[in-house]
Every structure is written in C-alpha cells, then in structure tokens.
Amino acid sequence: MKKWQNIRKVVLAYSGGLDTSIILKWLQSTLDAEVVTFTADLGQGEELELARRKAEMLGVKEIYIEDLREEFVRDFVFPMFRANTVYEGAYLLGTSIARPLISKRLIEIAKETGADAIAHGATGKGNDQVRFELSAYALNPDIKIIAPWRDWDFKSRTDLFEFARMHQIPVEKDQQGEAPFSVDANLLHSSSEGKILENPALPAPEYVHIRTLSPEDAPDQATRITLGFKKGDAVSINGKNLSPATLLAELNRYGRDNGIGRLDLVENRFVGMKSRGFYETPGGTILLAAHRAIESLTLDRGAAHLKDELMPRYAELIYYGFWFSPERKMLQAAIDLSQEHVEGEVTLKLYKGNVIVEGRQSKKSLYSSELVTFEDDQGAYDQRDATGFIKLNALRLRTLARRCQGNQEKK
C-alpha cells in the first residue's frame, strides 16, 4: 500500500485471537514491515503465553506481554467509579475504560523500539477504533496509525477464516463448535457481540455467559460482605485491605457466584449506529452500589446533585474515547475533590443477581439521628422554622398563580 510504503516497523495491539493474528500476518505480507506485538494483561483471564507462542509462530522477534492489572484498576477503573459512571443509564464502560491504557503503552513501546506506526484490530464500524486513535493522538500527535479493517479487502469474518486457513492460522471454536462471538474481557467486565446477539429480539443463549452464574443457579443462601472506602476508592473487603486489582478480582468472585452483573443492552455507538451487546460486570456492579451508598452518607446534597448532573457528560467522554482530553481531566478534578470525605464501610447482601445495601457507616457521616428522629430531638431542630422556609420558596409560585388568576378573570 502506497500510503504505508515508508513504514518499516509497527507495534500491534495483539490479543492472540483470530483477528489480530490475521492482522499480524497481513502487516507482514502487505507492508513487508517488522511487527512488534504488545499484549496487555488487564485481567482478561486468558493464558497469555498462548499469545506469545502464536506471535513466535508468526515470526515476531520483539514480543511485549505486560501485567497492567494494578495500573488499570488504580488509574482508570477507580477514578471512573468515583463518578458512579454509567453510559445511557446502564453500561459500566468496561471496554471503553481499557482502551486509553492500551494506547498509552502502544505509544510508549513505539518510542522504545523506534517503530514508525502502531496498529490495532478494531473494526471500521465500532467505537474502539475511535478510542484507540484519539488516545494515541492525544499522546503523540504525529504517530502513524494503521487500522487494517479500514484498509484491507476482507468484508466479513468469513473472509478472515479463509485467510486464516490459507496461512495456517488456528481458528478458535466456541462451545458449540462454531466460530466464537466477538468477545472483549478485562478485570472489570466481559462483553460478547455478533452472531445470534445481532438480533435484539432473541435472548442471549446461556453459553454466552463467561463471568457469572445464572441467578436461578446461584445459591439459595445470601452472601454478606462489608466493603471499606477511603477517599472514594474501595480499599478493603471484610476488614482486609487489598490492592485495587486484587479487590476487584475478589468482588468479581462474589458477583460471579451470586449471579450478579448481567446486562443485555442496545446502545448508541459514537459512529452513529445502534448495537446490541451482552455484558457481565460482576464486581463493578457491586462496587457501584456500595460507592453510591457510602456517598449517600458522606456527600453534601449540592455536591451529590452536581455530580449526578456531570456524570452523563463524563460517561460520554469515556465512551467516545476522550479520556486524555482537557474536559475529562477538568471533570475528574472536580469529582476527585468531592471524594475527600467519602470513606467508611458499606454492608451488602448478595442474592441471586441482586446487590442489596443493608447498612453503611462513616466517621465523616453527615447523617444526624438527632435531626431526623421522630422522637424528642432535645431541641436540635425547631419545626416552626419550616414555616418561613416554605413561604420564601413558595413566593414565586404564589406570584405566578396570582397572575394566572388575573388572566382568567379578564377572560
């Protein structure tokens, strides 16, 4: 290809799966370029040495496989959860939040190895192409980016299978012996798309679920846990301090066993189309419920309501790929400031797909039992003060009502 004719070395975001293995071979054969592979361990639960062996089989000399789980949760997942972030009221952004970190390392490795370009396996129809590339350009405005799905002649995954067969690239099968769903996974979630899921009228088959038990098959006995928070981040489970990645992995285990975190969603992609995906976010679902509970105790009403107003915009920025944008950083600064006193413990009951808050406590609590009691408050609150409060707040409403009455009388 003429537009890539001067490229001699490319860093490829490589999962070891079918798509990126074909891309690796395509880059080698089409561009005659040396390919460096980068595989990020974000807690996807796969055997990453398999990716190394596949890369070696395809002739790759420089292979990067890095454990980024702690950085992923500490610097990306937790900051996002401080905002109680959900996209379109439901999606916990498990795929979206992983892309900036992968792009960051692609740019760094390109610099370390003297590569001319980076490459990714995102299709030309999806959000990930935008997320990868916006993040990369934010960190290196001059980087060259190769997106094979937008350049090659393959039109479908069937074409990919034929290319793989011709070049003896192994093709994975699902539990039914067929080509697998399009799956993305990390420590926060897993997502499945394609095949039968492309019809939003049909239910997802049970074998699609890879992270959770069915709620019907979950234990009949509830599980109770206590989650500890400091400055808005979860720091402990049942009194035991854990690192960010270890804590999320433990929450995933609790969520998996109790059938928590399944989501069947039709969402609006950034590129303009609607898509249907099936998501499993067991630990994240528990974390969100607990964080909202501790905030309810420690966050001032005005700050809490402002956060709720800002959150959809913040979620949209992450979903669209603007993690490194100035506006996301501005919002993050405000969100982080709001978390200064968000600390304490939340007790949760996990039962057959449900996360039920049973209690919350904090040394920084704004809750006053003296003020809200139905019993004698010993003078903590004078109910007669409410009369003036109501009159002042009703002033404009009464003025408007009188105007309406006057207009009706004139008729």
Swiss-Prot record:
GO terms for molecular function: argininosuccinate synthase activity; ATP binding. ATP binds at residues 13-21, 40, 121. Keywords: Amino-acid biosynthesis, Arginine biosynthesis, ATP-binding, Cytoplasm, Ligase, Nucleotide-binding. This is Argininosuccinate synthase. Pathway: Amino-acid biosynthesis; L-arginine biosynthesis; L-arginine from L-ornithine and carbamoyl phosphate: step 2/3. Disulfide bonds: none annotated. It is found in: Cytoplasm. It is an enzyme of class 6 (ligase). L-citrulline binds at residues 91, 96, 127, 131, 182, 191, 267, 279. Its EC number is 6.3.4.5. GO terms for cellular component: cytoplasm. NCBIfam families: argG, PRK00509.1. It catalyses: L-citrulline + L-aspartate + ATP = 2-(N(omega)-L-arginino)succinate + AMP + diphosphate + H(+). The gene is argG. L-aspartate binds at residues 123, 127-128. HAMAP family: Arg_succ_synth_type1 (MF_00005). Homotetramer. InterPro entries: Arginosuc_syn_C, Arginosuc_syn_N, Arginosuc_synth, Arginosuc_synth_CS, Arginosuc_synth_type_1_subfam, AS_cat/multimer_dom_body, Rossmann-like_a/b/a_fold. Coiled coil: none annotated. One of its GO terms (biological process) is argininosuccinate metabolic process. The keyword Lipid metabolism does not apply. Belongs to the argininosuccinate synthase family. Type 1 subfamily.
